[in-house]
């Protein structure tokens, strides 16, 4: 009988830990989603500086697109400003199909799709974002966009 009681207590404890883990994952996903929502809102206002607030402000930030690798927050900002130098080029940004993988309480990966609605075209693609929780909040430390 003692073994059954101990087994039952162990199962309840394990279920409690799993529930807390799922709750934590949901919380982290929501916090990261907020960063991405803020980014798309800034982009859609024509505010590239505001969009970049979601990125780690470090020379170690890595942005990969096609065959190009850009390192550093400022070079990444400069790249965006050069490539999207008008509201027409910026269009309306939408993120979709988001899949969150929580690696630790301070690290996560997001796989998703992006699209720009513009007058003359509608470019779109996929991305993988690596997020880390910093003192300022969740920030993208690596962005691989295609």
Residue ranges: model-predicted function:
Residues 48-103, 115-122:
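A solvent-exposed, acidic/Ser-Thr-rich amphipathic alpha-helical stretch
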Residues 111-115, 130-132:
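Residue-level recognition of well-ordered beta-strand positions that form the cores
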Residues 4, 16-54, 75:
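Short, low-complexity N-terminal intrinsically disordered segments enriched in polar/charged residues
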Residues 124-146:
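Short beta-strand edge/turn micro-motifs at domain boundaries
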Residues 2-9:
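Sec-dependent N-terminal signal peptides
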Residues 106-110:
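Short, hydrophobic/aromatic-rich segments at coil-to-beta transitions
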Residues 95-97, 111, 140:
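Hydrophobic residues on conserved beta-strands that form the core of alpha/beta folds
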């Amino acid at each position: 009988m003692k073994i059954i009681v101990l087994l039952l207590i162990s199962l309840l404890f394990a279920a409690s830990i799993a529930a807390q883990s799922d709750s934590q994952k949901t919380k982290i996903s929501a916090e990261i989603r907020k960063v991405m929502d803020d980014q798309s809102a800034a982009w859609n206002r024509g505010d590239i500086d505001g969009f970049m607030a979601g990125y780690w402000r470090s020379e170690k930030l890595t942005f990969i697109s096609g065959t190009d690798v850009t390192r550093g927050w400022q070079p990444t900002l400069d790249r965006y400003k050069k490539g999207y130098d008008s509201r027409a080029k910026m269009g309306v940004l939408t993120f979709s199909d988001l899949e969150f993988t929580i690696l630790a309480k301070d690290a996560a990966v997001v796989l998703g799709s992006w699209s720009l609605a513009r007058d003359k075209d509608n470019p779109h693609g996929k991305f993988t974002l690596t997020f880390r929780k910093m003192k300022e909040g969740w920030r993208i430390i690596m962005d691989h966009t295609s």
